[in-house]
A protein has these predicted regions:
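Conserved active-site-adjacent core of cysteine acyl-enzyme catalytic domains
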Residues: 41-142, 147-151, 217
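Noncatalytic regulatory segments and standalone regulatory/sensor domains
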Residues: 107-220
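Active-site nucleophile-adjacent alpha helix/oxyanion-hole segment immediately C-terminal to the catalytic cysteine
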Residues: 1-47, 178, 187-206, 217-219
Length: 220
């Protein structure tokens, strides 16, 4: 199953909340929905800044995870650090002109395996991943060894998937794809943006409101 172990990004929610839900459910053992995670991020995160920047930060994630009674943090490290720490981590990547959050699962035989909330279980070769990994940043949740779940552990089906579907299919190579294809990829991972209601005639004037838009945003 291409989306095995992944909280799939559907119903127009952000990649950040989907990636965090995937990590929490797959490594900690929670049973959260993406909406529950998003509500938690809004409640315990920096709500005004979330509205202003229209996205969730690693600090928002840290605060929500802390509210669940867990320690976590965002770090910078080398590729070797990501591999040797031997646990799943949220990592920001930038590919095909877009930025995105995915969950690092494992490194094996020169390939990096990730759980992508929009595209499923996919992989990159080592150098390609290094090229698209944003600022060498990773977000980790500290879980006692005896409590760690292995729902994100690499399985044979993940290895077969790489052979059955090339990376080109997901627009992860430096090729110029037709605009309609890029639109299709973007539409596949749409999200909602949190704004303030500026309609003075609305009973919710001045309160947070959701506007629908795409998840991916062009970096240039």
């Amino acid at each position: 199953n291409q989306f095995r172990g992944i909280v799939r990004q559907a119903y127009d929610y952000s990649c950040g909340s989907a990636a965090l839900t995937t990590l929490l459910n797959g490594y900690v053992g929670t049973q959260l929905s993406e909406q529950q995670t998003m509500n938690g991020l809004l409640k315990f995160g920096e709500t005004e800044k979330i509205i202003e920047r229209r996205s969730f930060s690693l600090l928002d994630m840290k605060r929500f995870v802390g509210a669940l009674g867990l320690e976590s943090g965002g770090y910078k490290g080398e590729f070797s650090d990501l591999v040797t720490q031997a646990q799943p981590a949220i990592v920001p990547i930038s590919y095909a002109g877009f930025k995105h959050f995915v969950v690092f699962k494992a490194y094996k035989n020169g390939r990096v395996y990730v759980a992508d909330p929009a595209l499923g279980n996919i992989s990159f070769d080592e150098q390609r991943f290094k090229d698209i990994w944003e600022n060498n940043t990773l977000f980790l949740i500290n879980v006692a060894p005896e409590h760690r779940k292995k729902f994100l552990a690499l399985q044979d089906s993940d290895l077969r998937h790489v052979e059955d579907a090339t990376v080109n299919r997901y627009a992860f190579v430096d090729l110029q794809y037709p605009q309609f294809y890029m639109d299709k990829i973007a539409d596949k991972a749409s999200t909602i943006r949190l704004d303030k209601n500026l309609n003075e005639e609305s009973e919710n004037f001045g309160k947070p409101t959701y506007n629908f838009l795409r998840l991916y945003y062009k970096s240039k």
